[in-house]
Amino acid sequence: TAPAIAAAALQSLKDSDGSMLLVLSADHVIQDVDAFHEAINIASQQVQSGKLATFGIVPTNANTGYGYIKSSKENSNGAHKVEEFVEKPDLKTAQTYLEQGNYLWNSGMFMFKADVLIDELTTHSSDIVNSVNNAINNATQDLDFIRLDKQAFESSPSDSIDYALMEKSDNVVVVPL
C-alpha cells in the first residue's frame, strides 16, 4: 500500500499544497457513522498540526486475527500517541492486551497531510518516494486517467504503509473507533 498511497500524495501535491488524504480499507463495515465522523474530525485536527493519524478499533475480545496498536494512556483531544504497532498475537497475549485497555485493533485506515506523509516517507523509505515520483513524472494522461510509468512504479519496493512508515515514525497518533 505504501507506493499507492505515495502516488496519491504526490499527485495531490501537484494539485494543492494543503491536501489531506483519508485512506480507507474497502473491507470495513462502519456501523456507527456518527462516531466515525467524529473520529475523522479528531484525526483531522491532529493531521492539521502535522501528525500522521491512524484509526484503532476498540477490541471487543481477545482476537488473534488482528494486529494491535499500543497507545499511550494520555488523551490529546481524543487522540493518543502510538507507542508501538504489534503483530497478530497469540491468544494469551491478546487477552493481556484486552485487559490492559490501551491496545486497539489496527484498522489499516489512515489520515495525513500529503506533504507530511511524503516528508516522513522520504525519511524512512526514500526508495519508495523516489520510484513513485519518477512514475508520476513520466506518467501519461489517458482521458480522465493518469497512467503512471509502469517500469518506474514497479521498481518501487512493495511494502505496506505500516512497515514502510507508520511503524518507524514517532509522529503517529491513533484515534479510537
Where are these regions (language model features)?
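Catalytic core of tubulin tyrosine ligase-like
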Residues: 68-177
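Conserved beta-loop-beta/alpha segment of the NTase-like Rossmann-fold superfamily
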Residues: 1-74, 123-124
